[in-house]
Amino acid sequence: MATVPSNPAFAPTLSTRGRLNGILFVALFAVAVTQLAAMPAIANLGISPLIVGIVAGALYGNALRDGVPASWAAGINFSARGLLRIAVAFFGLRVSLQEIAEVGWSGLIVSVLVVTSTLLIGLWCGMKVFKLDRDTALLTAAGSAICGAAAVLAFESALRSAPHKSAMAVGSVVLFGTLSMFLYPLAINAGWLHLDTMGAGLLLGGTVHEVAQVVGAASNVSPEATHVATIVKMTRVMLLVPVLLVVGLWISRSRKAGQAQGNGRIAMPWFAFGFLALVLVNSMQVLPGSVTQAVNSLDTFALTMAMTALGMETRFSQIRQAGPRALATGAILNLWLVGGGLAITLGVQKLLG
């Protein structure tokens, strides 16, 4: 086995090389994950490359982690942290104010009520009923309330929480989001929910976890419902910024009162402001459509890299400690999204005509 030169001048070079090798390793792994996610058997389930990435990364990280050189750890960590923040910021290019305005007040009100109520219920159930730590409860609630795995990533970065906590939250998104994608169209098409096209779009966009799952579910209802559902879902994504800021304020105040769990601090979510800035850029339509599409594709790949790296840093032994309780919290939230989401949708439609 080669020895590391003792001359300190070599250290930065070796450190940089190891970091780059780690990033390249994650990138190559993400390429394989992207190809795997594109297979019809997986793509037809509405499972995004992000979810496939964290699952595949976790399997590799637990079964073959000794095969990764220690010097690569910095690159893997950068992919799970630094690259993650950049990718979440560029997620803003998928949203425009014009699209949100197209659905009107109905979409905004449904989104705000669903996101707020789901976060509060998730925190209360997770921390008070199932005795989860603050970060795990918040990550699980954010994944259900806002935009699935992307929201988990954003909160994980801001909270600086352990990777296994994100994995548990993503597991909830996978299970209950996939169930919703199949069960919602069945109930809507059978007439059990008594929703018109607008109502179906509001419900699907306002309550299904992942963007891909929303599109998958709504496409089995009608093209019109798919259009409405996608815009409402993007409205929920837009709420990521104010929610992160409010959560940061809450944690900061809890720390001052000496009541916070964990490290009691939240990282400054500069990527949230980047997200908002890119929403404005997309709304002004200053970029050609082809450029926006290319950037969005690169952003999806960067998010896949981040999820893969998080999976590699996850240990199943840590998940087993709180996994059932996190899953139970996700189940309660899913029941709320179905029942409470339907009530909110019908109430808003009745109120606004």
From Swiss-Prot:
Pfam families: Cons_hypoth698. It is a multi-pass membrane protein. Keywords: Cell membrane, Membrane, Transmembrane, Transmembrane helix. One of its GO terms (cellular component) is plasma membrane. InterPro entries: UPF0324_pro (IPR018383), UPF0324_YeiH-like (IPR004630). It comes from the Bacteria. The chain crosses the membrane at residues 20-42, 70-92, 105-127, 137-159, 166-188, 234-253, 266-288, 326-348. It is found in: Cell membrane. Belongs to the UPF0324 family. This is UPF0324 membrane protein PP_3661.
